[in-house]
Amino acid sequence: MRFADTNVLLYAISRDPAEQDKAKRANDILAGRDLALSVQVLQELYVQATRASRPDALSHRQAVLLIESFRRFPVQDLTTGIMMAALDARQRFQLPYWDAAIIEAARAMGCTDVLSEDLSDSQDYGGVRVVNPFR
């Protein structure tokens, strides 16, 4: 199973003409069935998608409906176990905490790949590998 980072979801809803290739790729990814998310990813999506400075900002209601639609995928809750593993991974791999939390949520879901444009492509974090799907 693959784990999608927030940027995959954000590209899927982008109306920016400069991001249309990435939007198509993101929607192709979301059409698959082998995908997992986390509560953190959905929270970040809400914050970024409704940001007033975003040219194509969603309303609260639109964002809630979008998040509900993404619940068709398995979603990893944030637990104290994941938080503690992320704190460990932060130290071990010298990652920002929020990136480590993504890696550890993916691991908890049994994912071997994290689809992300924000983390280092091809980097392996103890059996969880980052893949940039937009390269």
Residue spans for each PLM region:
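Active-site neighborhoods of divalent-metal-dependent phosphate/nucleic-acid chemistry enzymes
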Residues: 72-114
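Substrate-recognition element of Asp-dependent hydrolases with the DxDx(T/V) motif
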Residues: 37-40, 116
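Acidic, PIN/NYN-like endoribonuclease modules and their adjacent C-terminal/linker elements
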Residues: 1, 103-135
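Short amphipathic alpha-helical interaction patches enriched in hydrophobic/aromatic residues
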Residues: 10-14, 49-53, 71-74, 90
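Short, conserved alpha-helical segments within structured domains
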Residues: 41-42, 62, 82, 102
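Short, well-structured N-terminal submotif of metal-dependent ribonuclease cores
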Residues: 1-37, 52-61, 65
